[in-house]
């Protein structure tokens, strides 16, 4: 028996100002991170087929909290604060960067990081710093180049290949694919990656379900 994830059932659990206020460090968490204009909220909404799971904002940098969502038993998505915005004081930027670093380095249940970047402006300094932190911590990374519908097919493929070459310089496990919350490009790829990262928890759930099945009687 296998347990399949129904991403449309994902729901919000809680918000926290920092790692110390998150629920217990258990199960499997997949973190989503990106610059404030990378389309992170729209990507989460498309992934889960929900219009308002993650609140989209016209104001970059609005998401100041760590938001936790339940995908399935023991499986969570963590929406990390956006970074790289211009309209926020330096002190707050530095505070958020420290919080991101602390989360990546200390959260034991973190098993994968999705970094969202605008396909037209990828691999900015903070994007690279985030990937470096993840690689140093042994965390696999899936880069999704968002707003892929903004480029024609040939340009899109060329940009993906270019960023993949850049990603090789980090070492570690860093994959790169195109994504569009508007057209659906890359949605199946992202779900497949999350399925892979959640697999150990799903296997444990399936085993637990089998253990709870009543034994069939062989008595005549």
Curated annotation (Swiss-Prot):
Cystine pairings recorded for this chain: none
Cited Pfam families: MMR_HSR1
Residue spans crossing the bilayer: none
Record keyword Nucleus present: no
Highest taxon above the source species: Bacteria
Main function: Necessary for normal cell division and for the maintenance of normal septation.
Protein name: Probable GTP-binding protein EngB
Binding site for Mg(2+): 41, 63
Domain EngB-type G intervals: 26-200
Protein family per UniProt: Belongs to the TRAFAC class TrmE-Era-EngA-EngB-Septin-like GTPase superfamily. EngB GTPase family.
Binding site for GTP: 34-41, 61-65, 79-82, 146-149, 179-181
A GO CC annotation given for this chain: cytosol
